[in-house]
Amino acid sequence: MTFDASLSVPSLHALPFRLGLLDKSPVAPGETAAEALARSVSLTSFADRAGFHRYWLAEHHDTAALACPSPEILIAHLLAHTRRIRIGSGGVMLQHYSPYKVAENFNLLATLAPGRIDLGIGKAPGGLPLSTRALQGGYDPARRPGFAVLAAELDRHLRTRDAPPAGTEDEPDALRATPLPALAAQPFLLGASVESARLAARLGWDFVFAAHINASEADLDQAVEAYRGASGGRAPLLAVPVIVAASREAAAHLASAQARYRVQVGDAPAVNVGSLAQAEAYVRQAGGGAPRHEPRETRIVHGTRAEVLRELDALRRRHGLEEFIVDTPLAEAVPRIASLRLLAGETEHAARGPSPASVTADAEALAR
C-alpha cells in the first residue's frame, strides 16, 4: 500500500504505518526542569488524543538539559493523565541496574495499566563517566555481567508470571518479580548494530534500530536483515529524528542546527553525545587512554507534513517496516510543539505560528 500525502491531510489512523513518540524531556534555555516535565505531561495527553501509538521516555543522567533520569517514575505519572496510548521507556540503561529490580518496576506498572506498558532497554550509559561511576558504585566492574547476560536475566524475570510450586518457596528458582501482571510489559531492545538485532531476536523481543543515533544506511540495512532473518521474519521498529514545519525551508533551518559526536577514550566502548562540549566533557571525566572524538553523520527527516510522511513511507516500503518512533530533536518549546502538531495533522494551529509568549498557554491547551 502506498499513499500520496499531498492529496489530503490523512489522520494518523489512516497512515500505512504506526507512529510513536520519543520524549527526552528537554529543558529549553531559560526554563526549569519542572516546566519541561509539565510539557511532557501535556504532550502525552496530546499524543493520546491525536492517535499516536506509543509514548516513550528517555533516560539521561547529570544534565541540566534533559529532565528525566528515571523513565519508570515518569511513566507512572503519565499513565494517570492518559487513557489509551502505550507508555514506556526508550529506554532503561540496563548496565546500571539489577535486572530483577527493573522487572519489579515494570511488572508493577503493567499491573497498574494492563496492556499499556512498554519496556525498552539500551546499552548506552545515558550520561558521562561521572554519573556512570555514581550509578555503578556498588558493583565491581570486573565482575559486572555483560549486557547480553543482564538482558537474558531480565527476560527470565519478565516471562515468569506463575507462582512457584508449593513447597519450593525457598529455592532459588522460586524467585519472582512481584507483582505478577496478567499482561506483561512489551519488551524492546534499542540498538544500532547487527549484534543488538540478533540479541533481540534471540530473546524474542522487538528490536528498535536507533537511526536517531546512528544514521548509517549500511548499518540499518544490515541490522534489519539480521533481525528479520533471526526472528522468523519479524519487522523491527525504526527510531528516526523528524522535524516538521510549515515549509521545507523552515524545517531545513531547524535541522541544520542539530549535531552529534562519537567519542572514545582508550579501549573503552565508544559513545554518542549531542554536542562538542559534551564530547570534551566526556574525555575530561573518563581520564586515561588516548581520546578521540569526531562528528557523526546526522540524517533528520524534515520538511512539510506531506514531505515527511512520504519519506517515512519510502522507508517503510524499503525495509518492510510497520512502525516508527519519532524523536523531535528540538529543545525550544515553540518549534517542538509546532512540529508535533503538524505531524499529527493540526494544520490550522501550525499556520498560526505560536509566539514565544504563548508557550505556557500552548502547553495548557495541549492537555485539554
Language-model segments: which ranges?
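N-terminal beta1-alpha1-beta2 module of alpha/beta enzyme domains
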Residues: 1-85, 366-367
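An alpha-helical appendage that flanks or caps ligand/catalytic pockets
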Residues: 2-13, 140-176, 218-319, 351-354, ...
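Acidic (Asp/Glu)-rich catalytic clusters
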Residues: 11-14, 48-49, 75-83, 110-117, ...
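Flexible, glycine-rich active-site loops centered on histidine and acidic residues
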Residues: 14-33, 95-162
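Conserved, mostly hydrophobic/aromatic
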Residues: 19, 47, 51, 59, ...
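Hydrophobic faces of well-ordered beta-strands that scaffold small-molecule active sites
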Residues: 19-23, 55-57, 87-90, 117-121, ...
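Active-site mouth loops of central-metabolism enzymes
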Residues: 23-38, 92-100, 181-191, 296-305
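A conserved active-site cap/scaffold subdomain adjacent to cofactor or substrate pockets
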Residues: 195-213
